[in-house]
Structure formats: structure tokens, C-alpha cells
């Protein structure tokens, strides 16, 4: 399975000519959706979902499937795709990928902002994308897509999460708000934890791909 990082919080998975995209929000490149058969969306914030680009993707591929929570689905009424609502504990198959849903809520953010629903996705029992939360996956996770910068988190929480999950490999997500100096700090912290756990932990640049075992 091939994993490609796009801007900020978007990743693309490819397997046997099937394409699955997670969280193609406003800070990612729209080309992430080229040829996509299915899209997973963790929550409704604009940096994770952008309705107009999903509409264009659905117009290009009328069989496009979108799997998400009820809060996101309510915002996509004008998108001509097959929209499926999922919740914590659900499992489903889409475009040849097996997916398990893990988690229910976004991490607390601003005290005056409501907490929205957030679902994480474990794809093919290989890649876990928690969305905007440090949700324990509850199972062994070979590849973790770990949030590394956000208004709702501290860097120390990222490290604690890596130590809790103990993946074989971890790649940065949710890093699009950082300048070069901030990205350098992320690289340093991931490098330190990589050395400590003797596991691959690093930041993928936008457009960079890795082949998973």
C-alpha cells in the first residue's frame, strides 16, 4: 500500500489501482482527489473538509463514496456522492479497503467553541488516522498518522501519544500551520522519539510517498 502526504492534514492511500483519500481540507492540494474512489472525513472543520472540491470530485466520478460522521454529512447536502454516516465501532469495506471507525469527539479546543464529533479511521489494520484527537486505537497500530501541531494540543501530548500507541512507524499530520522554524522543531521531536522507541518517526513533506509493508 502506498501512502502519500498532501498539505496539512490530508493523506492518500493507493492499493491495487484503488484510491482512498482522508481529510482533503482547504489547506491541502485538490489534486489529492484525482482518481479517488472513496473519501474518509474525520470532522467538519474547514482544514479537513471542503465541500466545493468534494462536489467537483463527485462530478468527475459519480460513484464517489464519502464516509464520515453525521455532523459532516449534514454539511455535504449539495455534494452528489454516496455519503455514508459512520460511528465509533463501525467497520466497512470501500474501494477494496477495510476500515474500522475509532473515536467520537474532537479534542477540546477554545473554551467558547463547541466540541464537534470526530471519528478516526483504521485502514486495512495498518494505518490509523485519529483526526483531531489523541484517541487510543485499542489495537496494535503499525502506521500512525500523528497530529504534530494544533490549537487543541501541546507538543508533549504528541510525545505521550506516540509512547502510548507505540507504532512501528509514525508520520506527521496536521502540520500546515507551521513555518520552517516550527517544522524544524517537529522534526527534532519526532527524531528524538524515533531514537527512543527504535521506530521510524518522521515528517513527510507534501507530495512525499512511502510504501508500507
Region spans (language model):
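Core dinuclear metal-dependent hydrolase active-site scaffold
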Residues: 1-34, 85-140, 151-157, 205-213
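Binuclear metal-ion centers of metallo-dependent hydrolases, dominated by the metallo-beta-lactamase
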Residues: 1-4, 77-95, 159, 169-213
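Short, Asp-centered acidic motifs that coordinate Mg2+ and/or phosphate
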Residues: 19-20, 38, 143, 169
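Active-site metal-binding motif and surrounding structural segment of the metallo-beta-lactamase
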Residues: 26-68, 142-145
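Alpha-helix capping/helix-boundary segments
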Residues: 46, 72-73, 90, 135, ...
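A short helix->loop->beta-strand "cap" motif at the edges of active sites that frequently abuts
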Residues: 60-65, 165-169, 197-199
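Metallo-beta-lactamase
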Residues: 119-192
Amino acid at each position: 500500500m502506498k501512502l502519500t502526504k498532501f498539505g496539512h492534514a490530508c493523506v492518500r492511500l493507493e492499493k491495487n489501482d484503488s484510491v482512498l483519500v482522508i481529510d482533503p481540507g482547504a489547506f491541502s492540494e485538490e489534486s489529492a482527489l484525482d482518481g479517488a474512489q472513496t473519501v474518509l472525513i474525520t470532522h467538519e472543520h474547514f482544514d479537513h473538509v471542503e465541500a466545493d472540491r468534494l462536489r467537483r470530485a463527485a462530478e468527475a466520478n459519480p460513484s464517489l463514496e464519502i464516509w464520515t460522521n453525521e455532523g459532516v454529512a449534514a454539511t455535504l447536502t449539495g455534494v452528489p456522492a454516496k455519503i455514508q454516516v459512520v460511528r465509533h465501532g463501525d467497520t466497512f469495506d470501500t474501494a477494496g479497503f477495510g476500515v474500522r471507525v475509532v473515536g467520537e469527539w474532537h479534542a477540546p479546543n477554545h473554551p467558547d467553541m463547541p466540541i464537534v464529533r470526530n471519528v478516526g479511521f483504521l485502514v486495512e489494520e495498518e494505518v490509523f488516522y485519529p483526526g483531531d484527537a489523541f484517541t487510543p486505537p485499542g489495537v496494535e497500530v503499525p502506521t500512525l498518522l500523528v497530529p504534530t501541531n494544533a490549537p487543541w494540543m501541546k507538543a508533549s501530548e504528541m510525545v505521550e501519544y506516540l509512547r502510548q500507541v507505540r507504532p512501528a512507524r509514525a508520520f506527521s499530520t496536521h502540520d500546515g500551520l507551521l513555518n520552517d522554524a516550527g517544522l524544524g522543531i517537529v522534526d527534532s521531536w519526532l527524531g528524538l522519539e524515533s531514537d527512543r522507541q527504535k521506530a521510524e518517526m518522521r515528517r513527510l513533506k507534501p507530495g512525499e510517498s512511502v510504501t508500507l509493508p
